[in-house]
């Protein structure tokens, strides 16, 4: 992202607030859960009812808690492994709620098949992008980078919603979702390529490991 939208820029705002919340007795995990819950409520109440502008603004505001909990963790000397897993899990939940709210409005508000398809692609690939990296790292492989990551994804989708809602036109959200859909598919391909070209990626697994992976895959 550009310097204007970077974490360093927001740190100037979040660091003092993070220190104040810590002094008040709040924890990073508490802030993570609150921010996610608020984002989910905003996305699933405002987007499906056609309030795209206010939905986009509300989700953007609560998404800032994703930076605030990290600032709190750094201020107290570091985060925990559980906190990292909780943060990543909550990110996936919030992203799913945003796309679910938008796909509902696309289908039943605007009746746009094209927007429904684009939003569903974005919903699926947003989860796959994260899963590829997590699964690769669990296997000792590399899956960093890619064209689109979560901050860029939020900026694109929320900008589309805010402009469509603010000006009462459909094309900003349509454009944003299709741009994001294509970019997300490219990112999945980039990450899979990074995994495949990682050292040891094509080494044969021992029979016991291969059987375990197969069994896990076949579980319901």
UniProtKB/Swiss-Prot annotation:
InterPro entries assigned: CDP-OH_P_trans (IPR000462), CDP-OH_PTrfase_TM_dom (IPR043130), CDP_ALCOHOL_P_TRANSF_CS (IPR048254), PIP_synthase_PgsA1 (IPR044268)
A single MF term (Gene Ontology): magnesium ion binding
Sequence positions that bind a CDP-1,2-diacyl-sn-glycerol: 29-32, 70, 74, 80
Keyword annotations from UniProtKB, A to Z: Cell membrane, Magnesium, Membrane, Metal-binding, Transferase, Transmembrane, Transmembrane helix
TM regions (residue ranges): 21-46, 52-72, 93-110, 116-134, 154-171, 177-194
Residues involved in Mg(2+) 1 binding: 66, 69, 87
Name the record gives this protein: Phosphatidylinositol phosphate synthase
Gene3D superfamilies listed in its UniProt record: 1.20.120.1760
Oligomeric and partner information: Homodimer.
Pathway the protein takes part in: Phospholipid metabolism; phosphatidylinositol phosphate biosynthesis
Note describing how the cofactor binds: Contains a di-nuclear catalytic Mg(2+) center.
Swiss-Prot/TrEMBL catalytic activity: a CDP-1,2-diacyl-sn-glycerol + 1D-myo-inositol 3-phosphate = a 1,2-diacyl-sn-glycero-3-phospho-(1D-myo-inositol-3-phosphate) + CMP + H(+); 1,2-di-(9Z-octadecenoyl)-sn-glycero-3-cytidine-5'-diphosphate + 1D-myo-inositol 3-phosphate = 1,2-di-(9Z-octadecenoyl)-sn-glycero-3-phospho-(1D-myo-inositol-3-phosphate) + CMP + H(+)
Cofactor(s) for this UniProt protein: Mg(2+)
Main localisation: membrane
Membrane topology, record value: Multi-pass membrane protein
UniProt-listed Pfam families: CDP-OH_P_transf
GO biological process: phospholipid biosynthetic process
Subcellular location: Cell membrane
Gene Ontology, cellular component aspect: plasma membrane
């Amino acid at each position: 992202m550009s310097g204007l939208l970077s974490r360093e820029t927001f740190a100037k705002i979040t660091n003092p607030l993070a220190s104040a919340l810590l002094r008040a007795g709040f924890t990073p995990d508490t802030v993570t859960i609150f921010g996610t819950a608020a984002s989910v409520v905003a996305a699933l109440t405002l987007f499906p009812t056609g309030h795209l502008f206010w939905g986009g603004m509300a989700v953007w505001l609560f998404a800032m808690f994703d930076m605030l909990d990290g600032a709190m963790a750094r201020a107290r000397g570091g985060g925990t492994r559980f906190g990292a897993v909780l943060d990543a899990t909550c990110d996936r939940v919030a992203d799913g709620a945003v796309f679910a709210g938008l796909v509902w409005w696309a289908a039943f508000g605007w009746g746009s098949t094209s927007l429904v398809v684009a939003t569903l692609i974005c919903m699926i690939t947003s989860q796959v992008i994260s899963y590829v990296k997590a699964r690769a790292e669990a296997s000792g492989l590399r899956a960093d980078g890619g064209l689109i990551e979560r901050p860029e994804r939020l900026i694109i989708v929320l900008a589309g919603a805010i402009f469509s809602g603010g000006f009462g036109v459909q094309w900003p959200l349509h454009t944003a979702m299709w741009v994001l859909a294509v970019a997300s598919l490219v990112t999945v391909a980039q990450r899979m390529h990074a995994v495949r070209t990682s050292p040891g990626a094509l080494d044969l697994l021992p029979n016991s490991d291969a059987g375990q992976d197969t069994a896990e895959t076949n579980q319901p």
